[in-house]
A protein has these predicted regions:
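C-terminal regulatory/oligomerization modules of transcriptional regulators
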Residues: 1-5, 124-158
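Short alpha-helical transmembrane interface motifs in multi-pass membrane proteins
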Residues: 7-11, 99
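Amphipathic alpha-helical interaction segments
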Residues: 12, 16, 40, 128-131, ...
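N-terminal helix-turn-helix DNA-binding core of bacterial DNA-binding proteins
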Residues: 12, 19, 23-65, 144-150
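A conserved beta-turn-beta hairpin within the catalytic core of GNAT-like acetyltransferases
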Residues: 16, 51, 87-89
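Charged, amphipathic alpha-helical coiled-coil/dimerization segments
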Residues: 22, 71-138
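Carboxylate-rich helix-loop segments that flank metal/cofactor sites and access channels
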Residues: 53, 69-72
Length: 158
């Protein structure tokens, strides 16, 4: 006999909705030739001068993934690398004028995907959901814990 569940399967609910939201985001951004990672790099590089390493951390990307992402942005003429004025070893990701235009469009797309998901809920439920998720993300579930077998996780923020 299977054990009796005493709580809703929060892991499934969060994983499933997150996965579906990511697929919708990928499809929507794909229409303008971007990935979610490319969007993340463009938007955060426009906020302030940031190094490739800083942007990788914000986007939860390893070095290889970040290099591939920036290579794609360079190839598309949306961003470039330039030396840091304060650290010879670091590279600043500089967004081009075309990249800034694409970033504004991609942010509209991202906002639209989020708006569409939230619009499927009544106003009162939407506000409660967002407050609860924000409380979890900045409180009890803010940081992962060490584990002998690392949990695979999706890219964060961005």
């Amino acid at each position: 006999m299977a054990p009796t569940r005493t709580e809703p399967d929060l892991s499934y609910l969060l994983d499933h909705t997150s996965h579906v939201l990511r697929t919708r985001m990928a499809a929507a951004l794909g229409e303008i030739g971007l990935t979610a990672r490319m969007h993340c790099v463009l938007v955060h590089a426009l906020e302030e001068e940031r190094t490739q390493a800083q942007l990788a951390e914000i986007g939860d990307m390893d070095k290889t993934t970040m290099v591939v992402t920036v290579d794609a942005l360079e190839k598309a003429g949306l961003a470039g690398r330039r030396p840091s004025a304060t650290d010879r070893r670091a590279r600043i990701i500089a967004v081009t004028e075309a990249g800034a235009e694409v970033a504004h469009r991609s942010q509209e797309i991202v906002d639209g995907v989020h708006e569409s998901a939230l619009a499927s809920l009544p106003d009162d439920e939407r506000e409660v959901l967002l407050r609860a998720l924000n409380r979890l993300a900045t409180g009890h579930l803010e940081a992962p814990v060490e584990s002998p077998t690392p949990a695979r996780r999706a890219r964060q923020r961005g």
